[in-house]
Amino acid sequence: GPETAFLRL
């Protein structure tokens, strides 16, 4: 979910 995009920082 959206949390994955955050982890890709």
Swiss-Prot record:
GO cellular component entries: extracellular region
Domain of life: Eukaryota
Record's keyword annotation contains Secreted: yes
Keyword entries, A-Z: Amidation, Neuropeptide, Secreted
Residues modified to Leucine amide: 9
GO BP annotation list: neuropeptide signaling pathway
Annotated compartments: Secreted
Primary location class: secreted
Role this protein plays: FMRFamides and FMRFamide-like peptides are neuropeptides.
Membership in a protein family: Belongs to the FARP (FMRF amide related peptide) family.
Protein name: Extended FMRFamide-3
Source species: Praedatophasma maraisi
